UniProtKB/Swiss-Prot annotation:
Any single GO CC term annotated in Swiss-Prot or TrEMBL for this entry: cytoplasm
Protein name in the entry: DNA replication and repair protein RecF
Name of the gene: recF
Binding residue positions for ATP: 30-37
InterPro entries named in the record: DNA-binding_RecF (IPR001238), DNA-binding_RecF_CS (IPR018078), P-loop_NTPase (IPR027417), RecF/RecN/SMC_N (IPR003395), RecF_2 (IPR042174)
Keyword Hydrolase in annotation: no
HAMAP family assigned: RecF
Stated family: Belongs to the RecF family.
Length: 364
C-alpha cells in the first residue's frame, strides 16, 4: 500500500498542508523543528491511533487552534482486489472522531487494521534493550495485521486476566478462581503459540537481513520466554502452583502477559554490549523483517516511516540500508536534517522534499 495524499490541518507546526508523496523512497530534509518528524507522526497517528511523541495536551494541536484534522488517501497494492481508501481523524474538545471510507468508526482499531504503518523513530531502539512490554507489543502488532482473529484472542486474554486479578484482590472463593484459571490457560496457550510461531517466522527473515547489513554481529536466532516454564508444565498447572503467591501479591504473576524475547548472537554475549548504532540497526532489521512478513502474508508492503534514519549510522551502513529499501516495492518516508552522503546514490529512485516553517516543497 502507499499513501497518495496527506492533508494536515492545525497539526503541530502545520497550519494547512496538502501533500502528495510518491511510491518508493521519499526523503524529507529540514532543520530541527521544521516539521519533518511531525509529518511522520501524523502518518503514525493514522496507523496506530496514537502519537509516538505524546498526547494532545503535549502540543499535537497547533498553538492558537482548537482542533486538528488529518486526512489520508491510500492505494492498496495487492495483486487481487486492490482498493483505494480515504480516512480521517479529528480531535475536537476531548474527543477523537474517525472516519474510514465515508463511515464513522467506533473503534480506532478499524482504522489501524486498514492502514498498516511501520514506524522507526528516536525511541525505537528501545525495542531490543528496554522493557518486555515493547517486545510483546511488537509481536502483537504483526499478528494483528496478518491474522484476522488475533485481536479477539488478545482481547479475550486481557479480559480474563483482568477478572482473575480482580478475584485475587478480593480473596474470592476457590471455585471461582479455578474457573477463571481454566479459561485463562486455554486462551493463554493459544496466544503463546501464535506469538512463538510468529517469532519463528521473523527469525527466518531477520537472520539474512542482519547478515547483509552488519555481518559481524552474527545473529543466530531469538530466545523466547513464554512467561512461565512452559517446557516443564502447561499454563493451567503453573497457575495452580503460583496461586498462593498470586493471592499474596494480588495479581497474576505468570502467563503470556509476562513473556519476552531477545536476539541471540554468537559473536557477543547479548544486546547489552551493543552500541547505539548497532542497536538501531538490529531494531530496524526486526522492523523490516516484520514488513517482509506482512508482504508474504498479505501480498502488499506496509508503509515504512523512518525518522532521522542516518543518525548514528556511518556512510557504509547508510548505503547498505538504503540499497535494501530501494530493492523493495514499498513506500518509504525518510527524514533527516541534511543530505547524508549515503543517500545520494538513491536520489534517482526517490523524491526529495524540503520541510521548512510548516511547508513542504519538492526539490527533485
Amino acid at each position: 500500500m502507499h499513501i497518495t495524499q496527506l492533508v494536515l490541518r492545525h497539526f503541530r507546526c502545520f497550519d494547512v498542508v496538502d501533500f502528495f508523496p510518491l511510491p518508493g523512497l521519499n526523503f524529507f530534509i529540514g532543520e530541527n523543528g521544521s516539521g519533518k518528524t511531525s509529518l511522520l507522526e501524523a502518518v503514525h497517528l493514522m496507523g496506530y491511533g496514537r502519537s509516538f511523541r505524546g498526547r494532545v495536551r503535549d502540543g499535537l494541536i497547533r498553538h492558537g487552534s482548537e482542533n486538528l484534522e488529518i486526512f489520508v488517501d491510500w492505494q492498496e497494492t495487492a495483486l487481487i482486489n486492490a482498493r483505494r481508501h480515504r480516512a480521517g481523524l479529528s480531535h475536537y474538545g476531548q474527543e477523537w472522531i474517525g472516519r474510514l471510507d465515508g463511515q464513522k468508526i467506533i473503534h480506532l482499531a478499524s482504522l489501524c487494521a486498514a492502514l498498516a504503518v511501520i514506524t522507526f523513530e528516536s525511541s525505537s531502539y528501545q525495542l531490543i534493550n528496554s522493557n518486555a512490554e515493547l517486545r510483546r507489543r511488537f509481536l502483537d502488532w504483526g499478528l494483528f495485521h496478518v491474522e484476522p482473529d488475533f485481536l479477539d484472542l488478545w482481547r479475550c486474554y486481557t479480559h480474563v486476566l483482568k477478572q482473575r486479578n480482580s478475584l485475587l484482590k478480593q480473596k474470592e472463593e476457590l471455585a471461582m478462581l479455578e474457573a477463571w484459571d481454566q479459561k485463562l490457560s486455554e486462551v493463554g496457550e493459544q496466544l503463546t503459540f501464535r506469538r512463538f510461531q510468529y517469532l519463528e517466522r521473523l527469525k527466518q527473515r531477520v537472520i539474512p537481513l542482519i547478515s547483509r547489513i552488519t555481518p559481524n554481529l552474527k545473529i543466530h536466532g531469538f530466545n523466547f520466554n513464554h512467561g512461565w516454564r512452559r517446557h516443564e508444565l502447561p499454563l493451567i498447572d503453573a497457575l495452580f502452583i503460583s496461586r498462593e503467591r498470586d493471592y499474596q501479591y494480588g495479581y497474576t504473576s505468570l502467563g503470556p502477559h509476562r513473556s519476552d524475547w531477545t536476539p541471540q548472537f554468537s559473536s557477543i554475549p547479548g544486546v547489552h554490549v551493543l552500541s547505539r548504532g548497532q542497536g538501531k540497526l538490529i531494531t530496524l532489521m526486526c522492523l523490516l523483517a516484520q514488513a517482509q512478513d506482512f508482504f508474504d502474508q498479505r501480498g502488499e508492503w506496509p508503509i515504512l516511516s523512518l525518522d532521522d534514519l542516518a543518525s548514528e549510522l556511518d556512510q557504509k551502513h547508510q548505503w547498505r540500508v538504503l540499497e535494501m529499501l530501494a530493492e523493495i516495492p514499498a513506500q518509504v518516508l525518510i527524514t533527516g536534517t541534511e543530505i547524508p552522503q549515503g543517500l545520494k546514490p538513491f536520489f534517482s529512485v526517490g523524491a526529495m522534499f524540503h520541510v521548512e516553517h510548516g511547508a513542504i516543497t519538492r526539490m527533485f
